[in-house]
Amino acid sequence: MMVINSVVVGTVVASKNVNEFEFVIENQVIDKIKKGEFVITKNTHGDYLLSKITKIVSVNALIGDKSEDASELAKIRGVIYSEEMLNNSSKFLASAKILGVINNESGSIESNVYPINVPQNVYLTKDDLLAKIFSNGSIEVGYLKVRSSTKVKLNAKELCSRHFAVLAMTGAGKSNTIAVLVQELFEKDKGKMNIVIVDPHGEYVKMRNTHILPAKLNPILVPEEHLAKLLGIGENSSVQKSFLVYAALTVKYECKENKKQISGLEYLKKIEEKLVECADKIANSEDKKRIYIEYYDGTRCRXKTVKKDDEMSINRVIEKLRWFINKNKNILGENEGMFDIKSDKINVLPLQKIEDEEAITIVGEFLKRVLKERIKSVHDEIVEIKALEKPTLVIIEEAHLFAAKNLKDRSGYWINRIAKEGRKFGVGLGLVSQRPKELNPTVLSQMNTKIILRIVEPTDQKYILESSENVGEDLLQDLPQLSTGEAIVVGSSLPLPALVKIKKYDGVLGGEDGLKNLKI
C-alpha cells in the first residue's frame, strides 16, 4: 500500500519533540486543509508518520508583533506596504499532533520514538489509508467529519465486550447514536447476541424489530432493607424499619414451612396482615408495659418486647405499605415476562410510567438475573432463561440514575459488577447519559469506548477527562463546538480517536423534542 499522496500541502518549519510539529501550508491547497485533517511526514528513521492538524493560524512577516497596535497597523496597511505585498506575505501555520508510525502492511498505528527533519514535505493522507484505519470494523456509525468519503466502522467485539458509553448534553443526538449502533449490531449479528435497551423515557419502543419486555417488580425478591426504602421509610426511622423487616421475614418463613410459593401483591398483602395483627395485639393488650410479639428471623421463632408507643410506628408502616401497593399495583407481580428475551429482536424494557426508585429496583433485579444466568452458561450449568445461553448486551439510558456515584442502589451494585466482570461471562454494557459527572467514576472508567457528543458544561468535561485514560485535553477542547450529531469516538473499538458525523437513523424514535412544533 502506497502511503504518500502526490499532493504536497506544506513544509515542516519546526519540530518541538517526537509528538508534534509545525508546518507552513502551501497557499494553493489552503482550501483543502482544515483543523482535524490527517497528514503524512517522515521521521529520521525513515518511517511514515500519521499526524492530525490541531490548530491553524495566519501569520504575516511584514506585520510581525505590531498586530495588536491599531495605529501601527493602519500605517502599515496604508503607507508602508501595499495590500498586494501584505497578502503575498501572509502564510498559514499549522500545528500537528503525531499519532504514530504507519504500518505499511496492516495500516495499524504504532508509537513514534524518532524526531522529524526540518524542513521536509507534508502530504495529505490518502483516502485508502484512512479507510484501512477507520473503516476496518463491522459497525458503521458515520463518517469522518474532515473526510466524508471515509466511513467510520467500529469493532463490534471490542464495543460490546469491553463496554461503551454515549455521553452528550440534551439535544446533541445521543438517542439517534444509540439507534444507529443498535440497528447496526442487530443487522450484523442477528441471532448471535441478545440486545436489551433499558428505556426510562420510551424513546426506543418505536424502533424496527423491537420486542417489548414488560417491566415488573416482584417485592419478594427485594431485600427487606431496600423494601423499606421503596416504602419511603427513612434511614432514621429505625423502629418502622424493624417492624417491616420482622413482618417480611415472618411471611417468608411461614411460606417456606407450609411449602407455599407467593410473590408480588400477595406477598405485600401478607406483610400487611402481619403488621395489622401486631398493631391489634398492642392495642388490645391489658398489660401496657410488657407486650410480647413473636416473629421469625428466617431460621427460628423469636419473641420481642414492644411498647404501647410502637403501635403508632406500626400503623405508619401499614399506611406506607398501602400507599405503595396502590401506586404500583400495575407493576407488582411475577417478573418472568421481563426475561422473555428474544435473540432475533431488539428487546426494549420501557420504564416511562414507573417512579425512579421502583425503576432502579427493577433494573437491579434484571441485571442481577442476566449476570447470574450468564455465569451458569459459561460454567455449563443449567440456564433457566434459554436466551441467556447467548452473550448479551444491555444498553442503559439515563445511566446516571442507575449508576450514581455512591453505588448504594441495587442497580448500581450490579452495573459495577458487570462493568468489572461482565466480559468474562459474555455480558456487555452500554451506558448513555447527559449528566456524566453524576455517573460513578469507577464504572465510567470501565467503558472502554466512549462516544462523546456535544458537551458544554466544564465540570462534565473535566469529569470525563479524569475518568478516561484515552481522552486528552485536545479532544475535550472540541466538545463545545460540536454540532448536533457530531461525536468524538475514542477507545478500543477504533484504532485512533476520530471526530465523526454520526449517520441518521432511518426509522422512528419516540424521544423527539416535544416542543419542536411549538410556534412562538
Curated annotation (Swiss-Prot):
ATP binds at residues 162, 171-176, 501-502. Its EC number is 5.6.2.3, 5.6.2.4. GO terms for molecular function: ATP binding; ATP hydrolysis activity; helicase activity. SUPFAM superfamilies: P-loop containing nucleoside triphosphate hydrolases (SSF52540). Keywords: ATP-binding, DNA-binding, Helicase, Hydrolase, Isomerase, Nucleotide-binding, Plasmid. It catalyses: Couples ATP hydrolysis with the unwinding of duplex DNA at the replication fork by translocating in the 5'-3' direction. This creates two antiparallel DNA single strands (ssDNA). The leading ssDNA polymer is the template for DNA polymerase III holoenzyme which synthesizes a continuous strand; ATP + H2O = ADP + phosphate + H(+); Couples ATP hydrolysis with the unwinding of duplex DNA by translocating in the 3'-5' direction. It comes from the Archaea. Belongs to the HerA family. A probably bidirectional DNA helicase. This is Probable helicase MJECL08.
